Amino acid sequence: MKISEIREMSAQEITGKLTELKKEFFNLRFQHGVGQLENTAILPSIRKDIARLMTVCREMNLNIS
């Protein structure tokens, strides 16, 4: 997910996507701990997407463009 795509989203869409990614990350971490996750490279990718969403959300709160 690109930062430009995130900036085009509304605050509600960002919050919804953030919740969705956090749930997915939790499930993937659990699978990784149990040893069922085959593609472990997806974990850092999701973590970075969560960080991007949180950054844009914070920018919106501070009215930074």
From Swiss-Prot:
Gene Ontology BP terms: translation
Pfam families: Ribosomal_L29
Keyword Magnesium attributed: no
Gene Ontology molecular functions: structural constituent of ribosome
UniProt keyword annotation of Ribosomal protein present: yes
GO CC, one annotated term: cytosolic large ribosomal subunit
UniProt keyword list: Ribonucleoprotein, Ribosomal protein
InterPro entries in the record: Ribosomal_protein_uL29, Ribosomal_uL29, Ribosomal_uL29_sf
Similarity comment: family membership: Belongs to the universal ribosomal protein uL29 family.
HAMAP family the record matches: Ribosomal_uL29
PANTHER family, alphabetized: 60S RIBOSOMAL PROTEIN L35/50S RIBOSOMAL PROTEIN L29 (PTHR10916), LARGE RIBOSOMAL SUBUNIT PROTEIN UL29C (PTHR10916:SF0)
NCBIfam families per record: L29 (TIGR00012)
Protein name per UniProt: Large ribosomal subunit protein uL29
Provenance organism: Desulforapulum autotrophicum (strain ATCC 43914 / DSM 3382 / VKM B-1955 / HRM2) (Desulfobacterium autotrophicum)
Upper taxonomic lineage: Bacteria, Pseudomonadati, Thermodesulfobacteriota, Desulfobacteria, Desulfobacterales
Gene that encodes the chain: rpmC
